[in-house]
């Protein structure tokens, strides 16, 4: 979470959004750095757990956060503007083994649609950078299934941003035994 926040280049007092906040790991790290954190998740039970996590931490450190149940596909309905968005979005169900190929292809198509819609919404509300994780699936036929990230970015009005020549984007973030590989992208508006 700390790496993601740092890649978002947020400064103390700025506001970040995690539209897939889950149990609020990214929000906690942001708030510890003095960044105002807003989290949205479509699972009310998960929002309840996130609230418990943030309240526990808040009693010791901070209270600069806000949680709300909601749909990441409708962000502009909930949020006017944020400085940055930092998130690990929904990556599909948990897999105990490599993904069946046909399922991976269907999931890829679903996630491409979801991410395009969400990034279009993010485009309406974000002032600066977006840190977004895209998955790649290892399949049962030893073929990897990747999302068409170029199309997603083109359709949503974003491009890849690289803060330094020494940092190559995307940043691979996974264990060799992972069934879902994660790639961290830093995005900016076109």
Give each language-model segment a name:
Residues 1-190:
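Class I S-adenosyl-L-methionine-dependent methyltransferase catalytic core
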